[in-house]
Swiss-Prot record:
Outcome after substituting S49F: In strain: NCTC 11638
Domain of life: Bacteria
Species assigned in the record: Helicobacter pylori (strain ATCC 700392 / 26695) (Campylobacter pylori)
Name of the molecule in the record: Uncharacterized protein HP_1070
């Protein structure tokens, strides 16, 4: 977990000051991601990909949706199905 946090922190520094999309993504996703190791990994991969793609904003929004919303939707669906 600590290793992923270090990757996350190091990976963020070169981009954070210059990228509006990353600032939005960081604010939106960090609270959701800090407890989950695989989500640190996903964020580090997102930063890596952002370096190579100019379509960073769209890419980050798509990844952010997958990381944040889909697990929440799955959990809600499970709760609903368990209730019946």
């Amino acid at each position: 977990m600590l290793a992923y946090k270090q990757i996350f922190d190091k990976g963020l520094k070169p981009y954070y000051k210059h990228s509006v999309c990353l600032k939005l993504f960081f604010r939106f996703c960090f609270l959701k991601t800090h407890a989950y190791q695989q989500r640190y990994q996903a964020f580090a991969l997102t930063l890596f990909s952002c370096k190579f793609f100019n379509a960073c904003k769209i890419f980050l929004l798509a990844i952010g949706f997958k990381i944040v919303f889909i697990p929440i939707l799955e959990a809600k669906l499970k709760r609903v199905s368990n209730a019946y």
